[in-house]
């Protein structure tokens, strides 16, 4: 291939590293110099409050806790290539300033998004384009993400098994997710606790759910008909 170091993806936004690129390599696209980084370099740069908008993350597979407790970070990282990342657990956990466009991220390799936006109290961006079909863990993903109220109805959550606390204390969230395939979910503990959520869930297949403890605790508005739910496997309500 004629790839030099980095290139612009066909989506017109993501900057990717060429297949033979190594950490530290640089390349220029549209007059901007981009640097290929590995996980260790990236974490050090974050610790040093470095500019991250021109970093190429194709070599990174683990972004767990990347911005955890980083109260000031709010840089544009829309060009990041996350197509090789498998875990984003706690990635923006308590990153209270972050609110940037990340809708074009290719998250199709990610399996764990639990606690990803936990207490990310400013985040409220469109992420409906995300391919989450390989994600198995979304526990507490938006817990205490008090601003988040976006349409994520098109998400393919058919691989998810743990949604415990997913929207717990997501105090703005009230979106239609009736079309979600939750047939593989076993844990829904506290899923809509302390939220204003009041949407139709009557068609959800919850037949594999075992844990439903505190699912709607302190949700004072939910009044939907869920009498058709098959809760025969539930051991904790």
Q: Residue locations for each model-derived region?
A:
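Negatively charged
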Residues: 1-236
